């Protein structure tokens, strides 16, 4: 038992040391974190879920995504209780993660110096912003700090939107709410707004696994941010989440229509469908191809394994 304890201490000590001395995770690190993903990746190693899939996911509900993830065993993917600039501006994107901790002056100086030696410019809270691509969402763990934990104001907000055309998700604060609100298309999910400046925090990791509330976020996760909260979808599950949610929406639309028409009872629609109802649904799909957010081939393949 003592030997096992020593091994664990050494393992986590080495892991922590390597994370602190490598603020930006290497490509190999990111591939290790996201090994389930087999598709296209960015040069930094992050999974690159397609723009088309991001648009499809933007149309689904938090509950639908949550249900699919929970069914797949991913139970730590949702974070709620946000303040936001606009409640009616949902967004999706690919996570670029960052983690901040309370400042330790000596370590902070060494890490700033190291970052500057590696080509980073200015204060460390601007480094993740410089790395953003179109479609990225800057997701940061600032340990819930709002007062003196304002990761961005309107200047950095403009830089973020210029680079990514997406919003941000911060387990921390932001300032300049009025100015941020003038950035057309931008939204921020934060723990609060405060006029203070960012101080006494330090950046210790970029593109590493982070915690947001009770949720875990990996680099390249698909972010679905809506008024209800934010759900973090592992990249390798994004397509499953999309098509399952889309199927449920089609099923519900068909059910609502048939209930209004009086063709079936609520018990028939809410219970296990009979073969006659299933056939009616398939014929309804044939007559309403414009309602399908996926191809009919994708839907048919999905329904082969569906238990209804």
Residue ranges and their predicted role:
Residues 1-4:
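Positively charged n-region of N-terminal signal peptides that target proteins for export
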Residues 7-16:
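Bacterial N-terminal signal peptides
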Residues 18-22:
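Boundary at the C-terminal end of the N-terminal hydrophobic targeting segment
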Residues 23-66:
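N-terminal pre-domain segments of enzymes
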Residues 45, 160, 221-223:
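Buried hydrophobic positions in well-ordered alpha/beta secondary-structure cores of metabolic enzymes
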Residues 56-219, 233-308:
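Feature captures the catalytic cores and cofactor-binding loops of soluble hydro-lyases/lyases
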Residues 229-231:
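Channel- or pocket-lining gating/hinge segments that regulate access to a cavity or pore
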């Amino acid at each position: 038992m003592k030997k096992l304890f020593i091994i664990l201490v050494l393992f986590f000590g080495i892991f922590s040391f390597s994370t602190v001395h490598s603020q930006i995770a290497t490509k190999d690190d990111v591939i290790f974190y996201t090994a389930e993903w087999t598709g296209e990746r960015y040069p930094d190693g992050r999974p690159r879920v397609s723009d088309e899939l991001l648009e499809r996911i933007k149309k689904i509900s938090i509950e639908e995504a949550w249900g699919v993830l929970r069914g797949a065993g991913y139970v730590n993917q949702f974070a709620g209780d946000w303040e936001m600039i606009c409640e009616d501006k949902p967004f999706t994107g690919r996570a670029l993660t960052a983690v901040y901790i309370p400042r330790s002056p000596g370590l902070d100086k060494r890490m700033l110096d190291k970052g500057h030696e590696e080509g980073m410019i200015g204060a460390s809270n601007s480094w993740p912003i410089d790395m953003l691509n179109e479609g990225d969402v800057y997701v940061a763990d600032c340990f819930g700090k709002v007062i003196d934990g304002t990761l961005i104001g309107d200047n950095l907000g403009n830089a973020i939107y210029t680079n990514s055309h997406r919003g941000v998700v911060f387990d921390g604060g932001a300032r300049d709410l009025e100015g941020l609100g003038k950035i057309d298309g931008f939204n921020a999910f934060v723990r609060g707004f405060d006029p203070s400046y960012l101080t006494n925090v330090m950046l210790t990791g970029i593109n590493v696994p982070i915690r947001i509330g009770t949720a875990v976020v990996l680099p390249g996760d698909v972010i679905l941010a809506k008024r209800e909260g934010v759900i973090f979808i592992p990249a390798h599950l994004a397509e499953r989440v999309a098509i399952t949610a889309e199927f449920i929406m089609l099923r519900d639309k068909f059910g609502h229509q048939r209930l209004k028409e009086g063709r079936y009872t609520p018990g028939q629609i809410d219970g296990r469908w009979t073969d006659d109802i299933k056939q009616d649904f398939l014929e309804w799909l044939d007559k309403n191809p414009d309602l399908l957010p996926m191809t009919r081939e994708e839907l048919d393949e999905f329904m082969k394994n569906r238990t209804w």
